[in-house]
């Protein structure tokens, strides 16, 4: 079966999702929207996909290659339908996922968020190394969660993630691969993008945080956070140990603890709530 898969260039109602990468490469439960779509098509028996894309095509090509990961053949074209030797059974526009055809993706930031919430259980079952640690709480075996951290379902904690002591993740929260949620932080109703540091005693609500960018899911307000102690981008690491932890330790050394008594009082330290500035 042949498929033409059209990739939207951007979204007038959710423009921030295409700031860092092409829209179809927006983070989505451990992979990208495009990768999840290809997984579904391969499961249907599709053997040949022609991707019609015009925005940062090389980035898309670097992610999906020639389709080897799905056992399908992938080609690229700016106008796939003009190929004489390609007779598609279907033409699909990637404005919703095949796994959830009733849910639009790009109509608003809330649509993108809602699609992920709806698919957490199904995609967790498909991903190697994910386990259900408690009802609705899905955690990668390659992540580390402090014993006194609180995970409240529904939530997703991806691979190579660190969740620090007394941190709270959930409900309604997704932590993407390679992120670091420092001690005492609280992330509720939000998405934390890949390789993102959320500082100690920082509070995120109803937001999408990726690197130092903070987006409110309802208002669409976008802010770049200058204080890397609160929110920042981490370099991609091969695993949880090593450079990721070293970078966070370096940040902590900038504010040394004065005494054991001071350290003990930090348990009740007030949180810093991060909110995008209105009007951006």
Per-region residue spans from a language model:
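N-terminal glycine-rich phosphate-binding loop and ensuing alpha1 helix
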Residues: 1-60, 72
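Glycine-rich hexapeptide-repeat left-handed beta-helix
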Residues: 180-280
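Extended, small-residue-rich solenoid/repeat segments and analogous flexible loops
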Residues: 96-173
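Residue-level signal for well-ordered alpha-helical positions
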Residues: 63, 118-119, 193
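Conserved beta-loop-beta/alpha segment of the NTase-like Rossmann-fold superfamily
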Residues: 44, 58-104
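Short, well-ordered coil/turn residues that connect adjacent beta-strands
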Residues: 30, 135, 141-142, 147, ...
């Amino acid at each position: 079966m042949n498929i033409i898969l059209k990739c939207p260039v951007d979204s007038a109602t959710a423009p921030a999702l295409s700031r860092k990468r092409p829209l179809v490469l927006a983070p989505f439960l451990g992979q990208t929207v495009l990768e999840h779509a290809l997984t579904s098509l391969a499961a249907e028996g599709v053997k040949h996909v022609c991707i019609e894309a015009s925005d940062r095509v090389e980035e898309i090509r670097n992610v999906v290659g020639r389709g080897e990961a799905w056992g399908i053949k992938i080609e690229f074209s700016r106008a796939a339908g003009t190929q004489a030797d390609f007779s598609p059974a279907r033409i699909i526009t990637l404005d919703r996922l095949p796994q959830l055809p009733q849910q639009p993706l790009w109509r608003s930031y809330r649509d993108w968020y809602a699609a992920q919430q709806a698919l957490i259980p199904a995609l967790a079952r498909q991903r190697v190394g994910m386990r259900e640690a408690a009802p609705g709480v899905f955690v990668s075996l390659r992540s580390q969660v402090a014993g006194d951290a609180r995970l409240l379902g529904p939530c997703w904690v991806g691979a190579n993630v660190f969740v620090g002591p007394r941190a709270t993740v959930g409900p309604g929260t997704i932590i993407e691969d390679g992120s670091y949620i420092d001690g005492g932080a609280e992330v509720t109703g939000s998405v934390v993008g890949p390789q993102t540091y959320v500082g100690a005693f920082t509070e995120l609500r109803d937001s999408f945080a990726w690197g130092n960018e903070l987006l409110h899911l309802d208002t669409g307000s976008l802010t770049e956070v200058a204080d890397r102690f609160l929110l920042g981008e981490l370099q991609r690491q091969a695993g949880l140990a090593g450079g990721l932890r070293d970078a966070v330790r370096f940040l902590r050394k900038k504010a040394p603890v004065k005494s054991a008594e001071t350290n003990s009082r930090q348990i009740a330290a007030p949180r810093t709530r991060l909110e995008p500035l209105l009007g951006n």
